[in-house]
Amino acid sequence: MLDFSDAQIYADTGLSLLAAQIYGNDIDLIANGAREFERRGAQIVDINFGCSVPRIVEKGCGAAYLRDPDRLYTAVQRTVEAVSVPVIVKTRLGWDDSDINILEVIKRCEDAGAKAVAIHARTVVQKYKGHANWDWIARAVETSSIPIIGNVDVLDAARPQAVHQGGIGGAESM
């Protein structure tokens, strides 16, 4: 089931819906939801493969996709095919320190048609603890043909400036 109540709020107030973030364990539902968000005015669709909340991951949503890059690819590809607006992806470095697959994930996202990837520079197991590993984001920038957005630890004005100098396409705070 899809809940579009927030999208309806925008329609009712006359505000425009810039981007809609979506996640789920059913690939067809993600694609159909993206299509509906576009119909309601979303100019960007953001698929969240970065959520590490245990009850979300246990249902096969969010960061659970990092364990199956083929499934992640299919979800991105079907969503790209379903909409005419840009599709971006939010993800993490990998499952844990022994399973960092961010470079593979980015390649799969590129191949599937994503227009950008936002990387939370921690693993699923880390959740929001410890330090973000910006080195992996720098590696991603070096190998990616699409913009990479650093997503974490933007605590002051100096961080985004340093990030930009490193070639990262942007920075966002959680």
PLM feature spans:
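Flavin-dependent oxidoreductase catalytic cores
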Residues: 1-174
